[in-house]
Each structure stands twice: as C-alpha cells, then as structure tokens.
C-alpha cells in the first residue's frame, strides 16, 4: 500500500482545475488494499472522498477528509458465449482507453461512449451516456467493497437501480459501496446505434459506402466531441455541466408552441427530454463569463476554467445560467457534477 501524503494539491486531480488541497491523500493500487485503508486513523467513512478521474467533481474548498485515489488497473475476459462477451475492467482504468481496447478486440456496445472523460469506476455512478447509449445498457454487474460488512459484493445490473444520470451509488448506496471493478456484456456482432443525425452522417462519411464498424462509430464520436468540446488538459472543464431536463408532455407542447424548432426527445414513459445546451444557447449565454469561469463559446452546455477560476466564480456562473434559463423557459436545470462539499450545490 502506498504511504499517506498530507496537504496534497488536488488541482491535477480535478479536470476543472480548481485549486484545492487534501488534508490526507492515498493512492489505491489494488482492491484488496481497501481492508487496510478502512483501518487507517485518517479514515472516516462519513468524510472520505473516493476519487477517480476527477471529471465529475467541483472542489469548492480544501478537502478536510481523506482522499483515496482509485488507481487499480486491469482488464480481463470472464466469459464468452452466444455472441456475448463478459469483460471486467478495474475501477482505475481510464474510460476512453478501455472503450478503445474493446473496439480493438472486435467487441461492440461501448463505441458510442468514446472520449467521455473519467474512469471505469465512475461509469455506473453517473450512468454515463451519449448518442443514445447509456452505461446501464451494457453493464452486467458491478463489484464493490461494502463498507457496512467490509466484504466484497457483486451487484447485478438490476440491483444498481439505474436511471437517467442516476444509480444506487448516488442514492441510498452512496457512502456504502466502493466500486472496485465493472463487468460489461458486449457483443461480438456489431449492432450500430445511430439515432442521432449528426452521428449517422459522420459514420456514413467515414464508412464511405461499406458496412460501418464499431471503430467507425468510435472514430465519428471522437471527431464530433473534439469539434464541440474543449480538451480538459488545455481548458479546464467537467464536460456537460447540466443534465438535459425531462419535462411533462404538456410542458413540452406549451414550449413547442413558442419555440417550434426546439429539440426534444420523447421518453418511453411519456415525458420529454429537452436539450439543456439549446436552452442555454437561446439565452445567448455562449461566451458569458464571471471571473475566470465562462460558458464555452462553441458549446453552451460546457463551462470552462478560462483564467484561474475560483470556486465562487463557477458557482455564480452556474447560478446565473439556472436563473436565466428558468426566467425564459420555466424549466429548471440541474448540475451534473458533484459539488464538494455538497452544501455548495445549487
């Protein structure tokens, strides 16, 4: 087990690049080390931060508790039958690298989720999704360390209570389960999901008349994301800052009367998902800046660290966007990233 480090700079460990320090910090390289970590004097179950890629957090101040950085790596095939492959990835694996690995193996299911920042361990927590695919569609099970019993358990997909950007791990399981690995059920036969027009067009261009492959879809997704989204290594950000709001069919119909070109996505339960980026863009907020935090000038759904933004800059900007969108559309936006501490959340 790695030694504990004190007063550790967390700026490199959060993709928005907010300045903060951890009172205590330790890197976890193997899942079995959890049994020792929970016995450290610095460990407090109520305050410990289990940190992956730092692409879904906003550090609003120095972190007073222990930060455990999940660095456990490894990918292995578990089973293969009837055109399906179960493949396990450790929580510390970089998500995009894992996606590319599965595509290179000739497996299908994750290609639409290419270039999403973060680690494998975070994928079930947020139920990450893009271009018509969510993590829940391909997750078979999640292996966790149960802090209640201090044992390893495996939760089936149904046990994880997945919903749009939600899961057991954000609700009643938060603070109990530490995700150590995820098992994915992937196909050996490629079945494309091309419900988004821009993706379908990009794949058609790449495949140039031949039957498209999972790699074509992955390459197209990467090209689209690179054209729209800033690289967090160059311009700090946490990807999509707001969830796409879901409203009733009646509310959507009312909005359509005033905004007939409004993008909308009917859901199986009769509700309608709206495009948060479009709502923000209609409020002419692209490029709007408070202190060092700004709305990206090409993608309204992304807030960026333009000039050494403070935590307060980010909070004020997010609050301004929420208020402005609500004033115009009477639709409430909710932030995707976790505010730390949670008392700062809007």
Swiss-Prot record:
EC number, UniProt record: 1.3.1.98
FAD-binding PCMH-type domain: residues covered: 18-189
Pathway linked to the protein: Cell wall biogenesis; peptidoglycan biosynthesis
Reactions that this protein is recorded to catalyse: UDP-N-acetyl-alpha-D-muramate + NADP(+) = UDP-N-acetyl-3-O-(1-carboxyvinyl)-alpha-D-glucosamine + NADPH + H(+)
Keywords attached to this entry: Cell cycle, Cell division, Cell shape, Cell wall biogenesis/degradation, Cytoplasm, FAD, Flavoprotein, NADP, Oxidoreductase, Peptidoglycan synthesis
Main location: cytoplasm
Subcellular location as annotated: Cytoplasm
A molecular function GO annotation: flavin adenine dinucleotide binding
Gene Ontology BP annotations: cell division; cell wall organization; peptidoglycan biosynthetic process; regulation of cell shape
Positions of the catalytic residues: 165, 240, 336
Domain of life per record: Bacteria
Cofactors (names): FAD
Keyword Cell wall biogenesis/degradation: yes
GO CC annotations on file: cytosol
Class of the enzyme per the UniProt entry, highest EC level: oxidoreductase
Keyword check for Cell wall biogenesis/degradation: yes
InterPro entries for the chain: FAD-bd_PCMH (IPR016166), FAD-bd_PCMH-like_sf (IPR036318), FAD-bd_PCMH_sub1 (IPR016167), FAD-bd_PCMH_sub2 (IPR016169), MurB (IPR003170), MurB_C (IPR011601), MurB_C_sf (IPR036635), Oxid_FAD_bind_N (IPR006094)
Stored NCBIfam families: murB, PRK00046.1, PRK13903.1
Family: Belongs to the MurB family.
Function: Cell wall formation.
Name used for this protein in its record: UDP-N-acetylenolpyruvoylglucosamine reductase
